[in-house]
Amino acid sequence: MADYNAQTTTFDNLNIFTSSSATYTKNTDIFLKSGKHGYPKRGTPESAGFDLKADLTKTVTIQPNETVMISTGLYLELPENICALILPRSGLSYKHGITVANAPGLVDPDYRGEIKVLLRNEGNIQYVVEDGDRIAQLLFTPFFAPSFVTVEELSNTTRNVGGFGSTNLK
């Protein structure tokens, strides 16, 4: 159903949809304090993720099967019901085997520290990260904090308890 009272707020090329029926309408701005590389930018106007850049004083070499924490120099203040997910960049993963170790990394709305990225080298050769390299993506998304209701039994479904391949591959 369409919400005809919905609005879109633009902040540094970030469009946030707000609706009177949604739970995340209290705030629509995302405040940031950025380092020398400025605020995160999207690769194209339709990109969902905002590129995070390495904020380094010297290059970092990631050996195969090694995980390192990379600074971004970025600090965020997120609205109450919006979180940010730190995701790998597909080209970095495909071409070099570099991924986000704890993907998706989660930035909670009450976190005020620097956004850092755990990069992992899944490749066979070392990889060098330089200052200003685009190392990951940041995806903003609303989330819901439900109330839990304890019950004796859950309702039955066709699937029921089947999991981990129970629906087959073909």
Q: Can you say where each PLM-predicted feature lies in the sequence?
A:
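DUTPase catalytic domain/fold
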Residues: M1-K170
